Swiss-Prot record:
One of its GO terms (cellular component) is host cell cytoplasm. One of its GO terms (molecular function) is DNA-binding transcription factor activity. This is Protein E7. Highly phosphorylated. Homodimer. Homooligomer. Interacts with host RB1; this interaction induces dissociation of RB1-E2F1 complex thereby disrupting RB1 activity. Interacts with host EP300; this interaction represses EP300 transcriptional activity. Interacts with protein E2; this interaction inhibits E7 oncogenic activity. Interacts with host TMEM173/STING; this interaction impairs the ability of TMEM173/STING to sense cytosolic DNA and promote the production of type I interferon (IFN-alpha and IFN-beta). The E7 terminal domain is an intrinsically disordered domain, whose flexibility and conformational transitions confer target adaptability to the oncoprotein. It allows adaptation to a variety of protein targets and exposes the PEST degradation sequence that regulates its turnover in the cell. Keywords: Activator, DNA-binding, Early protein, G1/S host cell cycle checkpoint dysregulation by virus, Host cytoplasm, Host nucleus, Host-virus interaction, Inhibition of host innate immune response by virus, Inhibition of host interferon signaling pathway by virus, Interferon antiviral system evasion, Metal-binding, Modulation of host cell cycle by virus, Oncogene, Transcription, Transcription regulation, Viral immunoevasion, Zinc, Zinc-finger.
Amino acid sequence: MRGDKPTIPDIVLEELVLPVNLLSDESIETDDIAESERSPFKIDSTCKHCHCRVRLCCVATDAAIRVFECLLQSEFSFLCLKCSKELLRNGRT
């Protein structure tokens, strides 16, 4: 189209390029990622101070339990109730 005012013969509908619907092939990421299922777990460990058995029960995903397991094998440890009372004086200073 050239000129100040377009006229009907200036518009050729067959040559118009229509934009592609950009959302037609897209999906929301949450549709692709399934909700991770949480399961109950029992974690048996020992007290760092007196070496008695400590059991922790929780609900978590498999991936979270694997991360927690790595922590327990490296630098994370538990205290039993008796040792936590003695060593930490029930949180009092």
